């Protein structure tokens, strides 16, 4: 879990995690980034006091950064360290709330697909698409809102956006990468290259995409994005369009469609992305969100 200076959000994330039966069998590793300015100092201090009081997990390890790394560098460093030690990782940031069945889904998914070299990650959030989705489905690429992966998949991660961008252009994959031109992922890579973004997630998506690897999404979200704003936010403010009804039952693996990518799912994502353009009053937040999703 990655935290910064938002005490209330950190508490909420932990409270939801503890509602998972698997929490008491789970090793919780918390990365607490250092304040990047004086304004964040008090929030970081209070958040660190709280995380040192947490109980209810099998074990708890806290890494307090001495200097501000920024979320992108902190996540890349933390995930790399954990998969090198444990071979797998479940990743949460402090502005995500999870279903009581989140850890069950993640652990079962990690076990089920460990040997599937074409699967990059297990993801807990799915957009509130209009069409009913299968119990779980595969989409090409990787994602970043409550996810899990293995060392063998994280090893394909490339943090060089220029390399990724050139590969996508050379293979003429821009349209597919952008979900039929419905979402500006290629632009995110370009922003990363020119220095106007500092992203890990767009590089994670592109790395898996170029290797023809897939992410498993639940048909109904097991993760909710908390509506937060300000300097401590890891995702920026959350437009209403992204809010979901969280799944209240476990995943039924007998109903999962996991043989190949779901074309139905891709189309549903595309339609959702296009629908965002109708949210005129949320355009500023949407642009912030695109940046915050991938400025990490």
Predicted regions and their residues:
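An acidic/histidine-cluster motif and surrounding catalytic segment
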Residues: 1-91, 96-296
